[in-house]
Amino acid sequence: VHSIPGEDNDEGLVVLADGCLRKYIACKGINALLFDELDREQMANQFAALANSCESDIQIIIKSRNLPVDEYLSKYQSLVKTDIDYLNWYADHTDKWFRDIQDVHFVPQREFYIVVGYQPDDCKDFSKPWSGRRSVQKHEEYVDILNRLVRTCFEQLRASNLRPQVLSRKEVRDLIYIELNPSLSQLDPHAPTTIAGTSEASTLAVSALKVTDDHLWLDGKFIGTQYLSAPPHETWMGWLVDLLTLSVEYTFSTFIHVCDQDKVRKRLQFNYRTGVVTSTQLATPDLDSIESTRSAATVIQEFLRSSNKAFDISMYISTNAESKEKLIQHMDEIRRVFKNRGATMDRGQMLQLDAWQSTLPVGVDKLAIVHQVMSPVVGTFWPFFTAGCGTPDGVPFGFAIASREPVLLNPFFRGAGKDANNMFVVGTTGAGKSFAISMLILRLLPLGTRFVLIDKTVDKFGAYRFLTELLGPDLCAYIDLGPGSGLILNPFDLGPEDQAGTPSADKVSTLLSLFDIMLAPEGRDELNVEEKSLLDGLIHVAYMEAGLQNKVPIMSDLARVTAQAAASETDPTQRDRLSQFARGMSLFTKQGAFGGLVDGYTNFDTDKLFTVFDTRDVNDPRLERMAVFILTEFIRRKAAECKLRGARFAAVIDEAAMLMRFKAGARLLDDLSRRARHYGMMLVCITQQLKDFFRQSEQADSVIKNSHMKLILRQDPSDLKVLKETLRLSDAEVTAIEGFSRDEEKRKDSQMLLIVGAVHGTIRLVPSPMDYWVCTSEPIHDIPRRTEMMKQIKSKNPSFNHTDMCRQAVFFLGMHQE
């Protein structure tokens, strides 16, 4: 390294001692274990396109470091921020239980880097070293060329869903420093600041180094490096996937050198001519040579007629250990993994220094032991494999089926390429949708997240009712919404985005959509423009009159204003229309059949930590659509309030297909999914009726597109085709979904496909015994047993309230099960 110029936040540029320039791109891996043959072929083609588009050499680096599982899971406790004792206790219990059941000791953390190089004209003369000087103009000219190469590489990586990001100067210095100081960097991973008068190399390379024939000793670590001496006889997409199975830490470096294409053509033609002579002009023709000559002719013709290029590939992999004996074991494991794929790794005897330097992130192939391949084949060297799924931090949620690694889930994590916090959950009856979401709610509540949930249960033992009873009336509310419940949610309530006494344009638009449901004639989904114009004016009058008394209007107020307008109207057509509106509204006032739901001021606490609205008693189809619509609008207001207070907010709509059955509901759900990012909220849409959900296909597609996370549980076979097309699932993923076991163990170990952005993976949802007894809604055995346990606890502790009984019951049932 000659220098790393610029400020820390600038794009990282490394100038090497020979005058060459380097820039760096970091990217994410892809869990390709569920990809089918077509997907893998496409990935190989994209990687070949990346190699073809590069006009200079590139180095691809994979750094795999093993994070102790306890340290990995500590990310959950670091996010907990609640002053509620029971939630703190539950988070601690979950954390300890999840640690106890781990069957892995570490979680591999894989980082992927691409080093793009450029050799300027003033350093191509190998007969004399670079002077170390060039004019500012020349330097900027060369950097512009390098930037163009980086942009080309960047776009190719982005097209492959690898989420590339150009590293800053500080990130580049830290990357190099960590490799040169393996022990020091564990104490502080940040490189020392550049010191005036001291070379960059001296600043970064501060550790002692000792070179032996078969290993290096660097900063207290024994390091061994091996190189690829013979690739497999035939490579295929995925032959490098076994790197995921390595239990050792390693740095894997691949160089792709662009060959001189003219020289390659001449060499191929010479080999062909030589083969023709040796195979045909001998006394006894060599049939094997004739056949190989024909194959060579085919390769030459294909190469000459296509845009394919020839590349020199070299591969190196280094690992470290605390002792020489342990290092030998690590190197043996690496060789064994490559041997299983038909490749040979050489120990690098007497070549350890050059081999190790070829793994450093400076884009220099010191050893240069290369293997020539054509561009279709270079695509099979795709190295960006990962077995991870979930999010970088969050709540413990399950285990990856492929790697057994713990899976964390944080809907609110911030990452590149993340559009929204929304989640889409789909599964057939009994697949465990409500169970999974109940468990997620239980683990997100200690993180300070507030929840509103809409559900329509079959009986009084709803999937979420017990969860509210467990947390208690001080924290939760379970609202049985219905015409006869006595509980009212006023649709005219204003939110923080509305001025006092004056509805915003969005509020008026939402009310007009509500009146589409209430007043639209049979056969029509909505009112016409003229009818909406009349109602718009009446709504403003109702708000103005109520505002004089420092109140918001209720449905009776609007009905009265409408009746008064009809009485004073002189135009017969308008009078008839207003009278028709007034009669229609009267059905939804206290004098009408449905007024008990919407006519009056909101009469329950809307500021609980967790609120569940159960619409089981809303049976009329039109009233049901109204109720779900009003509740969804209530969610929008709560999201705006939480944003104003800086609180996390999540809304769950269980069976979101209810909203998709009518246009106004579909538009509202679509609008809410789009605005969720603005509010910083999480919207969870749950459905089992996929065909109903797609009744309004445009809005349904938009809702799913705005869902960064998706949980796909066991499916009805008839829905798999729609699901595959909608979510663009591979054949392998569909096969995995078909193989998800039925709920014979009552969701104690259910399986699902988890999609977080571009990362797909199958996971096992493994609740703790206490989670199970909180979240279960199994009516034949579980609920009666839980109820009986509560009675026993009450008989022994008469002073316990209902919340205490719930908490003790699940605790003892969990202990018994465990």
What does each model-identified segment do?
Residues 1-384:
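Extended, folded cores of ATP/NTP-driven motor/assembly subunits in large transport
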Residues 436:
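Hydrophobic positions on the alpha1 helix immediately C-terminal to the Walker A/P-loop
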